[in-house]
């Protein structure tokens, strides 16, 4: 990272010729704050994340997201990718719609007008467009085996508990041995003739009690290896993982619909990987700087008249 100096009014950071401004940061921050609060409530901001507050974590995410949009716009310049007139019109209409949804307090808090919002939507659209440009020829063939999705029921006997902050606390050796003994007893019951595995799940499992469909690389390695080696209807031996002891029953060794969906997911992951490699190499050489004084002065908004969270929803309504 190469640092420069000197900032314009309301300029929070610079990346080469691109600037991230206070109104842009506030639009991202307010929308993300309201989305979190609508799901988790205001108490989410009291949570400690290994010495960092949730509010600081969200601020850092906002900064990273906006900085990436700016860097991707520079990448678009490198590839001569631009918005066409229809896309610019969509950005203008999206900005008008979002601005009209705001009340006076929200406009004042975020310091926005239609011109600023139009630029934000244009830059966000261009970032997405350069992503699509770079990955347009990435269409790998994914085999059924690579994308295979299986369906299981399982019983989990945990070997940990959690503290008040949600952090895992490992069981003592004595408690782990008790958990193992319980799991072994349940396994014996599961393999008895006429045993109802689902009833044992409901009675004993300390994990999710629903049916679980998954593909390779989506769960703990020991669990995956044991499950993928089962035949339909077969019950595993005891599977030990960092989470605890599992007993797995295979319901289906090949879920056609889920496997097809997983192929789409794997292709997208490979495209993201290709883009990430080019983006990371490009971004490493960019000159950037942050206005520390202004950045430190930015905080979450505590105002009952501020509740907007539709900025990105409106974008997707216009751009898909």
Question: Where do the protein language model's features map onto the residues?
Answer:
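Peptidyl-prolyl cis-trans isomerase
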Residues: 1-10, 17-20, 48-320
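Periplasmic POTRA and POTRA-like interaction domains that precede
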Residues: 12-39
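Basic, Lys/Arg-rich alpha-helical nucleic-acid-recognition elements, primarily the DNA-binding modules
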Residues: 42
């Amino acid at each position: 990272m190469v640092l420069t100096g000197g900032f314009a009014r309301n300029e929070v950071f610079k990346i080469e010729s691109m600037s991230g401004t206070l109104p842009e940061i506030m639009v991202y921050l307010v929308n993300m704050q309201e989305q979190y609060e609508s799901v988790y409530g205001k108490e989410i901001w009291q949570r400690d994340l290994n010495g960092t507050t949730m509010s600081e974590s969200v601020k850092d995410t906002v900064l990273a997201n906006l900085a990436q949009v700016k860097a991707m716009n520079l990448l678009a310049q490198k590839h001569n990718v631009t918005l066409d007139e229809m896309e610019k019109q969509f950005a203008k209409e999206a900005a008008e719609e979002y601005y009209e949804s705001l009340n006076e307090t929200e406009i004042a808090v975020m310091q926005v007008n239609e011109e600023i919002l139009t630029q934000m939507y244009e830059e966000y659209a261009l970032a997405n467009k350069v992503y699509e440009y770079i990955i347009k020829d990435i269409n790998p063939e994914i085999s059924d085996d690579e994308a295979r999705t299986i369906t299981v029921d399982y019983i989990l006997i945990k070997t940990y508990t959690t503290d008040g902050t949600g952090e895992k606390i490992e069981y003592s050796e004595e408690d782990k041995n008790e958990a193992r003994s319980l799991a072994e007893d349940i396994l014996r019951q599961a393999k008895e003739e006429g045993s109802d595995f689902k009833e044992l799940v409901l009675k004993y499992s300390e994990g999710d009690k629903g049916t679980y469909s998954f593909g390779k690389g989506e769960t703990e390695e020991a669990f995956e290896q044991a499950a993928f080696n089962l035949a339909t209807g077969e019950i595993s031996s005891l599977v030990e993982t960092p989470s605890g002891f599992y007993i797995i029953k295979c319901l289906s060794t090949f879920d056609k619909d889920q496997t097809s969906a997983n192929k789409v997911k794997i292709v997208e992951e490979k495209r993201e990987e290709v883009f990430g490699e080019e983006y990371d190499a490009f971004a490493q050489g960019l000159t950037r700087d942050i206005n520390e004084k202004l950045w430190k002065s930015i905080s979450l908004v505590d105002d009952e008249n501020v509740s907007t969270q539709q900025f990105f929803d409106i974008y997707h309504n216009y751009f898909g």
